[in-house]
């Protein structure tokens, strides 16, 4: 495919753009042209720049902290640094048992997070109150919506990394992203 000549006006520019059909996509890729949808581009950016906020309530928090150490290095998945503020994060990782007194705090922090926001429930205690099944504990999915559940007591860092990858896949497959960004 030849490179387009210099245009003499806007009409010629539109003619050249229209010439790039799906059949010519391979040739266009060789010229450095990328074809995608706006939804796919926004979802790609979101899935590769997740800002997690830790909320460690028990022993699972130790495994969550080791996930960001050099051995596992979640930076390669786009989750650079754990944030301490809900206003700077879009992912909340709840690790440990949730008591009735802690539930309003979790809900309040989740509501402070900007849209879009996601949540991961890490460990048996956060998911189903675990071995401490008594009147004072509740599963975290009764407090906030959970996107990914990570089983285990405590789950290994590899399991949490896999949960992060599952969340990235969920973000990638979302539709209507641009409409929600533009409030349409």
Curated annotation (Swiss-Prot):
<dbReference type="GO" id="GO:0008137">
    <property type="term" value="F:NADH dehydrogenase (ubiquinone) activity"/>
</dbReference>
<dbReference type="InterPro" id="IPR006137">
    <property type="entry name" value="NADH_UbQ_OxRdtase-like_20kDa"/>
</dbReference>
<feature type="binding site">
    <location>
        <position position="59"/>
    </location>
    <ligand>
        <name>[4Fe-4S] cluster</name>
    </ligand>
</feature>
<dbReference type="Pfam" id="PF01058">
    <property type="entry name" value="Oxidored_q6"/>
</dbReference>
<dbReference type="GO" id="GO:0009060">
    <property type="term" value="P:aerobic respiration"/>
</dbReference>
<keyword id="KW-0830">Ubiquinone</keyword>
<dbReference type="GO" id="GO:0045271">
    <property type="term" value="C:respiratory chain complex I"/>
</dbReference>
<protein>
    <recommendedName>
        <fullName>NADH-quinone oxidoreductase subunit B 2</fullName>
        <ecNumber>7.1.1.-</ecNumber>
    </recommendedName>
</protein>
<comment type="function">
    <text>NDH-1 shuttles electrons from NADH, via FMN and iron-sulfur (Fe-S) centers, to quinones in the respiratory chain. Couples the redox reaction to proton translocation (for every two electrons transferred, four hydrogen ions are translocated across the cytoplasmic membrane), and thus conserves the redox energy in a proton gradient.</text>
</comment>
<comment type="similarity">
    <text>Belongs to the complex I 20 kDa subunit family.</text>
</comment>
<keyword id="KW-0408">Iron</keyword>
<dbReference type="InterPro" id="IPR006138">
    <property type="entry name" value="NADH_UQ_OxRdtase_20Kd_su"/>
</dbReference>
<keyword id="KW-1003">Cell membrane</keyword>
<dbReference type="GO" id="GO:0005886">
    <property type="term" value="C:plasma membrane"/>
</dbReference>
<keyword id="KW-0813">Transport</keyword>
<keyword id="KW-0472">Membrane</keyword>
<dbReference type="GO" id="GO:0051539">
    <property type="term" value="F:4 iron, 4 sulfur cluster binding"/>
</dbReference>
<feature type="binding site">
    <location>
        <position position="153"/>
    </location>
    <ligand>
        <name>[4Fe-4S] cluster</name>
    </ligand>
</feature>
<dbReference type="GO" id="GO:0005506">
    <property type="term" value="F:iron ion binding"/>
</dbReference>
<dbReference type="GO" id="GO:0048038">
    <property type="term" value="F:quinone binding"/>
</dbReference>
<keyword id="KW-0411">Iron-sulfur</keyword>
<keyword id="KW-0874">Quinone</keyword>
<keyword id="KW-1278">Translocase</keyword>
<dbReference type="GO" id="GO:0015990">
    <property type="term" value="P:electron transport coupled proton transport"/>
</dbReference>
<feature type="binding site">
    <location>
        <position position="125"/>
    </location>
    <ligand>
        <name>[4Fe-4S] cluster</name>
    </ligand>
</feature>
<comment type="subunit">
    <text>NDH-1 is composed of 14 different subunits. Subunits NuoB, C, D, E, F, and G constitute the peripheral sector of the complex.</text>
</comment>
<keyword id="KW-0997">Cell inner membrane</keyword>
<keyword id="KW-0004">4Fe-4S</keyword>
<keyword id="KW-0520">NAD</keyword>
<keyword id="KW-0479">Metal-binding</keyword>
<feature type="binding site">
    <location>
        <position position="60"/>
    </location>
    <ligand>
        <name>[4Fe-4S] cluster</name>
    </ligand>
</feature>
<dbReference type="GO" id="GO:0050136">
    <property type="term" value="F:NADH:ubiquinone reductase (non-electrogenic) activity"/>
</dbReference>
């Amino acid at each position: 495919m030849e490179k387009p000549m210099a245009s003499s006006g806007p009409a010629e520019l539109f003619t050249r753009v229209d010439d790039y059909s799906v059949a010519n996509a391979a040739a266009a890729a060789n010229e450095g042209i990328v074809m995608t949808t706006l939804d796919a581009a926004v979802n790609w950016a979101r899935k590769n720049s997740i800002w997690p906020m830790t909320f460690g309530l028990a022993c699972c928090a130790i495994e969550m902290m080791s996930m960001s150490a050099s051995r596992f290095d979640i930076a390669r998945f786009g989750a650079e640094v754990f944030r301490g503020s809900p206003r700077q994060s879009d992912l909340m990782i709840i690790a440990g048992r949730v008591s009735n007194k802690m539930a309003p705090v979790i809900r309040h922090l989740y509501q402070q997070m900007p849209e879009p926001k996601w949540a991961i429930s890490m460990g048996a205690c956060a998911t189903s109150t675990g071995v401490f099944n008594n009147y004072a504990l509740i599963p975290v999915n009764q407090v906030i919506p959970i996107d990914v559940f990570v089983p285990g007591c405590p789950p290994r860092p590899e399991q949490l990394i896999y949960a992060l990858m599952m969340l990235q896949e969920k973000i990638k497959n979302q539709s209507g992203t641009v409409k929600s960004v533009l409030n349409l």
